[in-house]
Amino acid sequence: MKVLISSPCSASVIIQYGIKSWPIWECEPSKFQWNYDDKEICLIIEGRAKISTQNGAIYVIKAGDLVEFPAGLNCEWEVTKSIKKHYRLGS
């Protein structure tokens, strides 16, 4: 399973999808396991994290990135700089 990253996310995409009205999630530097039961699309507002998947892929996400996590993904998050994101679950 692949994590898709669009960097930087354009202002037109933010407006088109109404991203600024999506809920916000925040996390201090930490390391934890996460399983995505549903697809998630998120816009990283602040911070940085390293995402390591079970198949050995490593992704670094940062402020300005639009990220899509597929349903069924199991991964480890390592938040290296306090992160804040708008997110939407499902299709």
Write out the residue ranges for each language-model feature.
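Conserved short histidine dyad/triad with adjacent acidic residue
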Residues: 8-10, 18-37, 70-71
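Short hydrophobic/aromatic-rich beta-strand segments that constitute the beta-sheet cores
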Residues: 34, 51, 85-87
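Short, conserved beta-strand element in jelly-roll/cupin
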Residues: 36-51
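Short acidic-glycine-tyrosine-enriched beta hairpin
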Residues: 55-71
